[in-house]
Amino acid sequence: MTTETFVKDIKPGLKNLNLIFIVLETGRVTKTKDGHEVRTCKVADKTGSINISVWDDVGNLIQPGDIIRLTKGYASVFKGCLTLYTGRGGDLQKIGEFCMVYSEVPNFSEPNPEYNTQQASNKSVQNDSSPTAPQATTGPPAASPASESQNGNGLSTQPGPVGGPHPSHAPSHPPSTRITRSQPNHTPSGPPGPSSSPVSNGKETRRSSKR
């Protein structure tokens, strides 16, 4: 035996709902992108009224005044309004007409701000939880460059000073190399020494000739 649920006991997220209600109104047909026809109907029992969404041929068969048994339905919030749906394996069966005690009020499909706040809070929780991870990951890299800059300013010459001190010493090395290159240039100036010897020899020969 399946237990029947009253309209007043329907809450968002409930599944496997079994109800008996009478159809009060049938709404306009709207078509989805897939070509399905969707119709929203207003139904009621003795505890209140609610909207139910019916698809395709079933929606065309439902008429106001029909007494219908819903099996394996579920409830969800659509645009801030509590709505009934036929779930997978669910069924709508006509069991009578007109003769049923019902109450049109309260209407449980009226827009409820609580449903909107719940949906907004759920979205905000999801949005807040997702960005926290990237923020945590971006924090450590920001600290590491600061530590590197401190090491560059410190006495340790391995990371930072490679670019700093060496360029200052670089200009000192080239002049030293130039000095070493100038030495071989001075060495060829040495040979004039031996060239002076033939001059002295010439003087001696002249002296000897005078003698």
UniProtKB/Swiss-Prot annotation:
GO terms for biological process: DNA damage response; DNA repair; double-strand break repair via homologous recombination; establishment of protein localization to telomere; mitotic G2/M transition checkpoint; positive regulation of telomere capping; response to ionizing radiation. Phosphorylated by ATM in response to DNA damage. Phosphorylation prevents degradation by the proteasome, hence stabilization of the protein and accumulation within cells. Ubiquitinated in a FBXL5-dependent manner, leading to proteasomal degradation. The modification Phosphothreonine is found at residue 117. Keywords: DNA damage, DNA repair, DNA-binding, Nucleus, Phosphoprotein, Ubl conjugation. Residues 110-211 are annotated as: Disordered. Its main location: nucleus. It is found in: Nucleus. Residues 22-92 bind DNA. GO terms for molecular function: DNA binding; DNA polymerase binding; G-rich strand telomeric DNA binding; single-stranded DNA binding. The keyword Phosphoprotein applies. It comes from the Eukaryota. Signal peptide: none annotated. GO terms for cellular component: chromosome, telomeric region; nucleus; site of double-strand break; SOSS complex. Pfam families: Ssb-like_OB (PF21473). Residues 129-149 have a biased composition (Low complexity). Residues 114-128, 177-187 have a biased composition (Polar residues). InterPro entries: NA-bd_OB-fold (IPR012340), SOSS-B (IPR051231), Ssb-like_OB (IPR048970). Belongs to the SOSS-B family. SOSS-B1 subfamily. Component of the SOSS complex, composed of SOSS-B (SOSS-B1/NABP2 or SOSS-B2/NABP1), SOSS-A/INTS3 and SOSS-C/INIP. SOSS complexes containing SOSS-B1/NABP2 are more abundant than complexes containing SOSS-B2/NABP1. Directly interacts with ATM, SOSS-A/INTS3 and RAD51. Interacts with INTS7. Component of the SOSS complex, a multiprotein complex that functions downstream of the MRN complex to promote DNA repair and G2/M checkpoint. In the SOSS complex, acts as a sensor of single-stranded DNA that binds to single-stranded DNA, in particular to polypyrimidines. The SOSS complex associates with DNA lesions and influences diverse endpoints in the cellular DNA damage response including cell-cycle checkpoint activation, recombinational repair and maintenance of genomic stability. This is SOSS complex subunit B1. It comes from Rattus norvegicus (Rat).
